[in-house]
Amino acid sequence: MQPGGDMSALLAQAQQMQQKLLEAQQQLANSEVHGQAGGGLVKVVVKGSGEVIGVTIDPKVVDPDDIETLQDLIVGAMRDASQQVTKMAQERLGALAGAMRPPAPPAAPPGAPGMPGMPGMPGAPGAPPVPGI
């Protein structure tokens, strides 16, 4: 085996995963989700990037004397679309992002210098008192 062979393979794998993640992010950004409220009386179309690209309001809910209901329906439709975008992102990117996480760092060895509470360190149980305290 040549020196650095494992590192080269690891780097190539990381670059492939990064490319897959970028492609998945681009697909997500270009995807569309449809949110609705009031049983479909208000509908919105939102891209995976969060950009609102369409709003449809059934004329039945347009009442000049009750603007608050229409406002609530629009907010509800937007919330529905936002939740769908989040779910889609988790489904598409979750597995890829998890595969790209670096391994956890090794635990510090016992007796690591400068760790509070270590025997013999000032202020630790059974250790000499800290001057001035």
UniProtKB/Swiss-Prot annotation:
GO terms for molecular function: DNA binding. Keywords: Cytoplasm, DNA-binding. NCBIfam families: DNA_YbaB_EbfC. Gene3D superfamilies: Nucleoid-associated protein YbaB-like domain (3.30.1310.10). Homodimer. Binds to DNA and alters its conformation. May be involved in regulation of gene expression, nucleoid organization and DNA protection. This is Nucleoid-associated protein Rv3716c. SUPFAM superfamilies: YbaB-like. It is found in: Cytoplasm, Nucleoid. Its main location: cytoplasm. GO terms for cellular component: bacterial nucleoid; cytosol; plasma membrane. Residues 98-133 are annotated as: Disordered. Residues 102-113 have a biased composition (Pro residues). It comes from the Bacteria. Belongs to the YbaB/EbfC family.
